[in-house]
Amino acid sequence: MRATGSVASRCRRKRILKQAKGFWGDRKGHFRQSRSSVMRAMAFNYMHRKDRKGDFRSLWIARLNVASRINGLSYSRLINGLKCAGIDLNRKMLSEMAIHNPTGFAEVANQAKKALEANL
């Protein structure tokens, strides 16, 4: 009897068609169209998972810029002041602090200001 590998082939096709669920038209039900669409979708998925890290960093920096200007500093001077003061908070933590605890962020910004003045 000839071995066709039908079980493996069927599993592979089912997996691709399952991943294509929600696609439009032939892309969801026909294996050939589904395979190329799923591969393209997975490539975009990989790429955007990498992009997301930079997108969030940009968001944190924009938030910090606004919050630091409210406290009389620019973003770059805030970060420089924090480095001079030896305060080791990352941008995500600072951004969360600026949103949820503005008074605490104001204290941190004041310490950064003092460190900048002491450095001059």
From Swiss-Prot:
Q: Could you tell me which SUPFAM superfamilies the record lists for this protein? A: Ribosomal protein L20 (SSF74731)
The record's InterPro entries line, in alphabetical order, gives: Ribosomal_bL20, RIBOSOMAL_L20_CS, Ribosomal_protein_bL20_C
Q: Which UniProt keywords apply?
A: Ribonucleoprotein, Ribosomal protein, RNA-binding, rRNA-binding
Q: Name one Pfam family in it.
A: Ribosomal_L20
Q: What is this protein called?
A: Large ribosomal subunit protein bL20
Report the sequence similarity comment from the record: Belongs to the bacterial ribosomal protein bL20 family.
Protein's UniProt keywords contain Nuclease: no
